[in-house]
């Protein structure tokens, strides 16, 4: 399957292009053909959402960026992920803070995000995150036939049907998450 200038292969043909947590989670999916989900090798210099879309001629409306956030309230600290369309902004200390019922929300520190997800920074995705994390997904993405996002490794991208995203563990589909 080709999307723009990207050539995607079945995840079963290229498992080495997926981070361990992503590959392990995808292997647990029932009623999903391995050909429904694909992965493409990319130049890591163009791993960022907007850069990828421009370089590989991919429609930005099918791209998803995953942001790991750290939420705090009193002595409690927890993590969540937000998957928003490429090019979107996210209102962390307004919308997300209220949604997570936190006193403060910020981007998770880079080293902590890498350690907790076991994925490479710049390619963290919503597939295979720690089970206790809440995953907020912008409603527009679940309507897409295919969403392109990180694979957990900066050398590749994952193409997954938007309809599968709403079935990820602890996922909530949220209108207007990305602005």
Task: Locate the predicted segments by residue.
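Extended, low-hydrophobicity, polar/charged segments
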Residues: 1-179
């Amino acid at each position: 399957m080709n999307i723009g200038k990207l050539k995607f292969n079945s995840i079963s043909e290229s498992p080495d292009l997926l981070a361990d947590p992503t590959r392990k989670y995808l292997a647990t999916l029932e009623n999903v053909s391995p050909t429904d989900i694909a992965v493409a090798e990319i130049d890591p210099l163009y791993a960022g959402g907007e850069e990828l879309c421009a370089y590989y001629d991919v429609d930005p409306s099918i791209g998803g960026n995953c942001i790991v956030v750290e939420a705090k309230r009193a002595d409690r600290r927890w993590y969540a992920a937000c998957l928003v369309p490429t090019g979107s902004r996210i209102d962390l200390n307004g919308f997300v803070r209220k949604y997570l019922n936190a006193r403060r929300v910020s981007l998770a520190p880079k080293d902590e995000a890498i350690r907790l997800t076991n994925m490479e920074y710049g390619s963290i995705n919503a597939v295979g995150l720690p089970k206790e994390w809440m995953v907020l997904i912008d409603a527009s993405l679940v309507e897409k036939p295919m969403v392109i996002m990180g694979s957990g490794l900066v050398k590749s991208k994952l193409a997954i049907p938007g309809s599968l995203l709403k079935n990820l563990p602890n996922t909530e589909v949220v209108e207007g998450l990305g602005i």
